[in-house]
């Protein structure tokens, strides 16, 4: 059995790490490099950095902090934010990122996924999907430009359909960001993640809702995800990554130690 991964997420805005609730009302929680170093030391398996306003503001992630992070940590990390071209992706990988993630740009131009995969290989192409449960239609729908509340918009895609589409186009991993659960610490959306797991043949990373150690156990066992991403519980020191790994190992979950 492949070991499950724990992935702290650092949302970046104006050069600082921020955290919101349901993708709104972001507050500053710290500086990028010290937080990254702390999580690496605690035992994180990898890190994800989202420049949350890059796509909405028509720019690409700031490469200066990417290189500083690469100098300070020795675990893999992924960066996202406004990546729309092969050359932009190449620059970020050259600055030290191990993977690049695309979200809104892929919705604008789905062929970008295939072109990135052809150039760099499936293993370093991650697709982020911001999924919102629409109670009025009892369906999961994909949102775009979610890093800026004023710019957020609906798309034509239902979540399950987009999951299948990005796999056909060559993505290597999928991060499912469950917007309704984001930042509220009520647990991962096991139902939605299980539906996606059933149609997802690439590694699936759960995102949105972690509030207790048991939530990580439940999402690994019940939704069978490959990795669990979390932010506020780590930023606010509610959960220590090393202690979480010990807990999960005691619960019989294969975890990297």
Curated annotation (Swiss-Prot):
CDD domains in UniProt: HisF
InterPro entries in alphabetical order: Aldolase_TIM, His_biosynth, HisF, IGPS_HisA/HisF, RibuloseP-bd_barrel
Any one Gene Ontology molecular-function term assigned to this protein's record: imidazoleglycerol-phosphate synthase activity
Catalytic activity: 5-[(5-phospho-1-deoxy-D-ribulos-1-ylimino)methylamino]-1-(5-phospho-beta-D-ribosyl)imidazole-4-carboxamide + L-glutamine = D-erythro-1-(imidazol-4-yl)glycerol 3-phosphate + 5-amino-1-(5-phospho-beta-D-ribosyl)imidazole-4-carboxamide + L-glutamate + H(+)
GO CC, alphabetical: cytoplasm
Catalytic residues (UniProt): 11, 130
Origin: domain of life: Bacteria
Coiled-coil region list: none
Cell location: Cytoplasm
Keywords: Amino-acid biosynthesis, Cytoplasm, Histidine biosynthesis, Lyase
Pathway annotation from the record: Amino-acid biosynthesis; L-histidine biosynthesis; L-histidine from 5-phospho-alpha-D-ribose 1-diphosphate: step 5/9
Main location: cytoplasm
Family per record: Belongs to the HisA/HisF family.
Cited function: IGPS catalyzes the conversion of PRFAR and glutamine to IGP, AICAR and glutamate. The HisF subunit catalyzes the cyclization activity that produces IGP and AICAR from PRFAR using the ammonia provided by the HisH subunit.
Subunit structure: Heterodimer of HisH and HisF.
Database matches in PANTHER family: IMIDAZOLE GLYCEROL PHOSPHATE SYNTHASE HISHF (PTHR21235:SF2), IMIDAZOLE GLYCEROL PHOSPHATE SYNTHASE SUBUNIT HISF/H IGP SYNTHASE SUBUNIT HISF/H (PTHR21235)
Protein name: Imidazole glycerol phosphate synthase subunit HisF
Organism: Shewanella putrefaciens (strain CN-32 / ATCC BAA-453)
């Amino acid at each position: 059995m492949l070991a499950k991964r724990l992935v702290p997420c650092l949302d970046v805005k104006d050069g600082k790490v921020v955290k919101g609730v349901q993708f709104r009302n972001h507050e500053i929680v710290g500086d990028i490099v010290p937080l990254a170093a702390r999580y690496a030391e605690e035992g994180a398996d990898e890190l994800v950095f989202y420049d949350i306003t890059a796509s909405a503001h028509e720019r690409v992630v700031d490469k200066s902090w990417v290189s500083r992070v690469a100098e300070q940590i020795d675990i893999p990390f992924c960066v996202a934010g406004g990546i729309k071209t092969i050359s932009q992706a190449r620059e970020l990988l050259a600055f030290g990122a191990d993977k690049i993630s695309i979200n809104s740009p892929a919705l604008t131009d789905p062929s970008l996924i295939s072109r990135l995969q052809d150039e760099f290989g499936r293993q370093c192409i991650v697709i982020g999907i911001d999924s919102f449960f629409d109670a009025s239609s009892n369906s999961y729908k994909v949102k775009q430009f979610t890093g800026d509340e004023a710019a957020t918009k609906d798309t034509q895609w239902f979540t399950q359909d987009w999951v299948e589409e990005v796999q056909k186009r060559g993505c290597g991993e999928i991060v499912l960001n469950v917007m309704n659960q984001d930042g509220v610490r009520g647990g991962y959306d096991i139902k939605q993640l299980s539906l996606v797991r059933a149609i997802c043949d690439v590694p699936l990373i759960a995102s949105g809702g972690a509030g207790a150690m048991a939530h990580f156990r439940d999402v690994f066992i019940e939704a069978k995800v490959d990795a669990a991403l979390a932010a506020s519980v780590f930023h606010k020191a509610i959960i220590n990554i090393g202690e979480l790994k010990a807990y999960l190992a005691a619960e019989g979950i294969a975890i990297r130690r």
